[in-house]
């Protein structure tokens, strides 16, 4: 009899786990468009607990605490027009940097004087990368590609678009390639690294990932940066730019102390994980983080969704073995015991995900691991009712009938 009950327990644990996953599927599809299902469905979108690891890297307002490579320097062009940018590039180029990456979009011709100055400055650069963009900024494939104005000459280009999901507007990923005018185009940061260290750039391609999760090392306080005025005045250490990657972009106006939101983004480095009011990082600094990640091969390995759901299924199955036994034989205390186990399991799983991310740069999706465990405690009541009905209707045997009557 005991062996028979064990077989029934195993069968019901498996079937109840499948039942939980069928309910999750219904919740996510929400065929009746119920608001409660919308809430549950939205919670299935990965809760970015890994943001905890990045949050706070935006802090610090004193000395630069360099975490981003010393080979990367960011220069603020501020409010300069094309002629002023040309003069700034000339000054930078005199210092013999290895690569100059210009994170500005020069769309269409301007006045002839400014364009001729900028074109001349570009031509003097040994290794130059210019930013381009796709018109829509959500990371989807599209063909509306904006290149540098032809009046400025032909130079190496890479798209500077950042992936900005509509839900929380947080930049976590970048696309490793895209199609523009039927041509394969690589991102701006990749082209910069390719000029500086081709072998490191090639390693990114060999990963064969359409998207890469950005491993943020820090904001302005974690990278060497200068204002354009300081560069023009020579107020920087001698030979400091020589042989380095110099990224020229925008991270503050000389005329307005308030942040300019056009190229200002939310990132996981924001001090507030939830309830954020203001963006925290300028686009050129995000590009510096991407360049740093490619150079150092400090990639984050993201597990495939099927793997996360499979692990989640096994975890839910193991919990159901415990929950069903308590439900049938210790029903009076079932909910109390189950909620304690549920809480401890959720804590351990979140901690494990954060630990793997911090120590091994492995990112698991948290929702597929935790959501089934959170739902199964209450869904067992529905599963029990269903099995009792099937027993009366079809004579189906079940482990739920092996304990004392508790209803």
Kindly label every feature range from the protein language model.
Residues 308, 329-407:
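Alpha-helical transmembrane segments forming the membrane-embedded cores
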